[in-house]
């Protein structure tokens, strides 16, 4: 009787060990897959961030960032300056500024502030389209697609931060847009920690996007 009990215990223990081995194997596979995915994603984001694809197109689109009581933040300022430079180089005859404002704001919008800045820097009023309703990157792309369809724009140069452009391009492609990415110049030295945060934000945001998980706080506009 004792021998039978001992044999049963060994069989149960063997099944338990086998189950634990399977779980460890599955965990290893998931970990390796995640490392491979995020490694590929880092490479792709970095490749887009370091390449300026600006070329003749139908329009230039400036993705929104924070504005402070009617004044563009340093990040938005740099994006708009880059758009002005592209316009002066005759890359495109039209500049689209994207971005709305929070309910608690002064009533100003990123798109409206961008339009005013472009006007002050020599871009004619009739050459500017200000989009003022979107509240995040996804909505900016959706509104850009509507503008492109309405105005029959076949190609657009999109301007934003380098690390932001990979996700923008993928969203634009999903919306049926032909876009060329053009990163705005860096603002001074970016610390390793800040840069790592930017990459982490974009990698996680894009992953959630592809998993069809909607966490607005993860894929909003830049605040700087």
Task: Label the model's feature ranges.
Residues 1-11:
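Short, intrinsically disordered terminal tails adjacent to the first/last structured region
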Residues 192-222:
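A transmembrane-helix-recognition feature enriched in membrane-embedded lipid enzymes
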Residues 14-17, 21, 188-191, 198, ...:
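Coil-to-alpha-helix initiation sites in intrinsically disordered, low-complexity, charged segments
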Residues 3, 40-199:
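A structural signal for short, hydrophobic/glycine-enriched beta-strand patches
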Residues 25-32, 130-136, 161-170, 215-224:
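Electropositive, surface-exposed helix/loop patches at the edges of structured domains
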Residues 10-52:
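N-terminal type II signal-anchor transmembrane helix
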């Amino acid at each position: 009787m004792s021998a039978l009990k001992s044999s049963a215990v060994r069989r149960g223990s063997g099944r338990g060990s086998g189950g634990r081995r399977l779980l460890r194997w599955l965990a290893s596979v998931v970990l390796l897959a995640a490392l491979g995915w995020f490694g590929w994603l880092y490479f792709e984001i970095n490749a887009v961030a370091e390449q300026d694809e600006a070329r003749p197109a139908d329009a230039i689109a400036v993705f929104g960032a924070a504005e402070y009581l009617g004044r563009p933040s340093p990040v938005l300022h740099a994006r708009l300056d880059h758009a002005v430079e592209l316009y002066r180089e005759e890359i495109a005859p039209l500049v689209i500024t994207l971005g709305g404002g929070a309910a608690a704001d002064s009533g100003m919008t990123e798109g409206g502030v961008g339009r005013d800045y472009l006007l002050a820097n020599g871009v004619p009023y009739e050459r500017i389209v200000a989009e003022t309703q979107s509240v995040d990157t996804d909505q900016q792309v959706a509104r850009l697609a509507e503008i492109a369809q309405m105005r029959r724009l076949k190609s657009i140069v999109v301007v934003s931060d380098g690390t932001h452009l990979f996700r923008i391009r993928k969203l634009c492609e999903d919306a049926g847009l032909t876009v060329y990415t053009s990163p705005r110049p860096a603002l001074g030295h970016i610390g390793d920690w800040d840069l790592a945060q930017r990459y982490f934000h974009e990698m996680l945001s894009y992953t959630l996007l592809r998993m069809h998980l909607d966490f607005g706080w993860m894929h909003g506009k830049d605040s700087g």
